[in-house]
Regions:
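Conserved beta-strand hairpin/beta-sheet module of binuclear metal-dependent hydrolase folds
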Residues: 13-108, 211-228
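Residue-level marker for buried hydrophobic side chains located in beta-strands
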Residues: 76-78, 120, 149, 222-224, ...
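Active-site metal-binding loops of divalent metal-dependent hydrolases
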Residues: 29-30, 80-83, 124, 154-155, ...
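Metal-dependent catalytic neighborhoods of phosphoester/phosphodiester hydrolases
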Residues: 129-139, 280-282
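Metallo-beta-lactamase
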Residues: 97-111, 115-127, 143-201, 206, ...
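Cap/insert and terminal regions of metallo-dependent hydrolase folds
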Residues: 93-104, 213-300
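N-terminal amphipathic/basic-hydrophobic helices that include classical n-h-c signal peptides
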Residues: 1-15
């Protein structure tokens, strides 16, 4: 991890990797900004600002790195970004500059929205599921008309009955139209929408967030960290977001998964890093890990 301006990686949009028979393509919904102090919890600003320099409102850059996973006739999308259903105040608060672009990114990668066969959600916070649906006049409809959407059942229940601490993170318009359209598959602890791609419930950020494991065979493994490790700078065990409802559970799960990822040489996807979509973990000292960016080509 660089101490001068943070980790640097490749261009985000349409970064592509092969993992066994899987083709993995990052498709971005653009950038937004969140408060740097909230993103790094108890870590002092004097440390985190070296990795993620804040703007004049103390906000840091955040990516929306969704992942297309292709094999055979299956095209699975992990998470769907922020979407297009927000007002001017929301756009200003999160420095969204007016428009997000996941559908465009998917098309630029060589696919149509109709090509997506499965959508797998790590959670239902607004920055992970916004393009589940799109505007169609005065209503919202599924963005991916031929896809089944895989949602964790406890997260749906919590999204319908949020508490005061996280109510602002949930927008039912991002998932209720999916139920109306009859395109939802619910799961509890694990789900494998296509062979080799498995969502695993991993609480900490909230009660029911999931990471996604990708098994490319012959020891070629990948992991989509979602908000367990939102950026490459969040790899160290104590670097945990203040947004996490259960930070000690986050810590336990980092201690469970990061050693496995480092020892196995797993390909890691950092959903919210605006510069490092793909990386691997190395252990510098016992229990001390850091991310090493993986340079990638760009999908045509």
């Amino acid at each position: 991890m660089s101490r001068e301006g943070g980790i640097r990686g490749c261009d985000i949009d349409r970064a592509v990797m092969e993992l066994g028979d899987f083709k993995l393509i990052v498709v971005s919904d653009g950038e937004f900004r969140l408060d740097g102090g909230a993103m790094f919890g108890v870590v002092p600003r004097t440390l985190w600002e070296k990795e993620k320099p804040p703007d004049e409102r103390n906000r840091i850059r955040m990516g929306t790195n969704c992942l297309l996973v292709e094999r055979g006739g299956d095209l699975l999308l992990i998470d769907t970004g922020i979407g297009d259903k927000h007002d001017a105040r929301f756009l200003d608060n999160y420095a969204l500059a007016g428009a997000t672009r996941l559908p465009e990114s998917i098309r630029q990668a060589g696919y149509e929205l109709e090509d997506v066969t499965h959508v797998l959600l790590s959670q239902l916070h607004f920055d992970h599921c916004g393009w589940n649906t799109r505007r169609d006049g005065d209503r919202a409809v599924p963005t991916f008309p031929k896809a089944r959407y895989w949602l964790q059942s406890g997260e749906v229940e919590h999204g319908r009955h949020p508490n005061e601490r996280d109510r602002a993170s949930y927008f039912p318009l991002n998932w209720e139209p999916l139920f109306e359209a009859g395109v939802v598959e619910l799961f509890t602890e694990e789900a494998e929408p296509i062979p080799g791609v498995k969502a695993v419930r991993t609480p900490g950020h909230n009660s029911d967030m999931c990471i996604v494991l990708i098994d490319g065979g012959e020891s070629r493994q990948g992991v989509f960290w979602a908000d367990l490790v939102p950026t490459a700078a969040h790899v160290p065990y104590p670097w945990i977001m203040s947004y996490d409802l259960y930070p000690l559970t986050t810590l336990e799960n980092k201690k469970r998964w990061l050693p496995r990822a480092a020892e196995g040489g797993w390909l890691c996807v950092f959903e919210h890093d605006p510069e490092v979509p793909f990386g691997r973990l190395v252990e510098d000292k016992p229990g001390r890990y850091r991310a090493v960016p993986v340079e990638t080509p760009v999908a045509a």
